[in-house]
């Protein structure tokens, strides 16, 4: 069972986001102990960077273990059919017992859609190609029962943020904090989303949040279409 699935995003004027991804998992069965003995997280090195900030295990017997995040493994993510060069970070927790609680935080910076080609090697590659604009698609479904799921994003005061929640409902709010607009979206008691034979992708059927700092939804699509036209992506011959 997931007790908390929380993401906090701080958006810079360039559109780059700094993400704090926190998760608290309670092991209830031997099967759950096996499933959670290793933590994995996927990211695209062309557009983002991710690392474990902390991992704490609260044992059922009262013992508290702080894991060494320097033992993190970073490797090419498993793929098939199409190989995008995605990577995965992994940290082994080791043996768990029912009643143990795993609490970890992952720090990520970057954005969530692909570049046309390889970017620079410095932090400028984490700035979205549509410079100054922030965009995200947040899945609000879960593979395990989740007590609370929260997505919180802070944007500069001068930026506007439009959003739409699809295939469900969530609680939302906007507040002014530390010279930023802070938007919070939350759902309680999220149950695993059932799948059916030959159904569409979960992004087209399960609850999700979409947001963009562009004045209109279509602006991002029009911008990318124009860039790809100029790049020659739609040319009939290479």
Model regions: which residues?
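Solvent-exposed beta-strand/loop surfaces of large extracellular or lumenal domains
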Residues: 46-89, 113-137, 164-185
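Carboxylate/His-rich catalytic cores and anion/metal-binding grooves
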Residues: 32-64, 206, 210-225, 230
């Amino acid at each position: 069972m997931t007790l908390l699935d929380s993401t906090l995003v701080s958006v810079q004027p360039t559109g780059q986001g700094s993400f704090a991804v926190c998760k608290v998992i309670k092991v209830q069965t031997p099967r759950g102990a096996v499933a959670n003995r290793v933590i994995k997280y996927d990211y695209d090195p062309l557009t983002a960077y991710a690392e474990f900030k902390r991992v704490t295990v609260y044992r059922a017997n009262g013992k508290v273990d702080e894991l060494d995040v320097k033992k993190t493994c970073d490797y090419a993510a498993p793929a098939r059919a199409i190989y995008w060069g995605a990577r995965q970070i992994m940290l082994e927790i080791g043996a768990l017992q029912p009643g143990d609680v795993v609490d970890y935080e992952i720090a990520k910076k970057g954005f969530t859609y692909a570049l046309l080609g390889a970017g620079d090697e410095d932090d400028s590659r984490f700035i979205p190609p549509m410079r100054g604009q922030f965009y995200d698609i947040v899945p609000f479904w879960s593979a395990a029962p989740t007590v609370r799921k929260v997505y919180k994003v802070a944007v500069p005061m001068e930026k506007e943020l439009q959003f739409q929640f699809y295939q469900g409902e969530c609680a939302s709010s906007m507040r002014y904090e530390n010279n930023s607009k802070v938007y919070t979206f939350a759902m309680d008691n999220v149950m695993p989303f059932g799948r059916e034979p030959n159904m569409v992708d979960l992004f087209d059927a399960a609850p999700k949040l979409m947001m963009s700092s562009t004045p209109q939804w279509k602006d991002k699509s029009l911008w990318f279409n124009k860039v790809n036209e100029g790049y020659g992506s739609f040319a009939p011959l290479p």
